[in-house]
């Protein structure tokens, strides 16, 4: 991998991580279509860590609330039954993370091999894109997300598990579930982004053993630094831009992009 490849892949990761168009699908397809060598797990970890840092920085106020809420749950025996707003957010995100954690552990090998097929990416891109369009058009989205029920959180968490299939899009499928449950576009996106924090931390912890097992040299550390910084900066800008966009616009451009991408993959590789 050279510097140009590293910067392009990190830029793709940062842009697509929080747009409802699937970062994993794009990171698989880009080297495949351009004939590049696989970027490797360590680079993926660096780029994903950059995106994680971006969402934590953007929602630093909520991250502070989560830290205080988590500390309260650990230190106060009755906090589990009488959770304040901060503790409630921690419990909500924990519940939403359980399904993807369990499914990820059970299907890790399948996701890392069979599910990376471009035909699967094309299918999920179109299918879940159309579901996003339907959810966005149903017209009942008036919940600002301030009073999500445990049932709603559980449903969004189950939806997130489908994002393990490349091409589905974690942000896309969780926003779709949120819209189906009546959340506004902005509220669905905000909760989806907050859900990315525990999922990203969990994924990073699971990848630590692979990171430590891989001996790194000076040049490789430089590429990893580029991947982290480019991914983080672009992801931060996308989060800000998408939340502003969804205050007044629909999901239609992302749906069109997903369908066109799927059709192009089928036409090119089918």
Swiss-Prot record:
Its EC number is 3.6.1.27. Its main location: membrane. One of its GO terms (biological process) is cell wall organization. InterPro entries: UppP. Keywords: Antibiotic resistance, Cell inner membrane, Cell membrane, Cell shape, Cell wall biogenesis/degradation, Hydrolase, Membrane, Peptidoglycan synthesis, Transmembrane, Transmembrane helix. GO terms for molecular function: undecaprenyl-diphosphatase activity. One of its GO terms (cellular component) is plasma membrane. It catalyses: di-trans,octa-cis-undecaprenyl diphosphate + H2O = di-trans,octa-cis-undecaprenyl phosphate + phosphate + H(+). The keyword Transmembrane helix applies. Belongs to the UppP family. Bacitracin is thought to be involved in the inhibition of peptidoglycan synthesis by sequestering undecaprenyl diphosphate, thereby reducing the pool of lipid carrier available. Catalyzes the dephosphorylation of undecaprenyl diphosphate (UPP). Confers resistance to bacitracin. This is Undecaprenyl-diphosphatase. It comes from Magnetococcus marinus (strain ATCC BAA-1437 / JCM 17883 / MC-1). The lineage of its organism: Bacteria, Pseudomonadati, Pseudomonadota, Alphaproteobacteria, Magnetococcales.
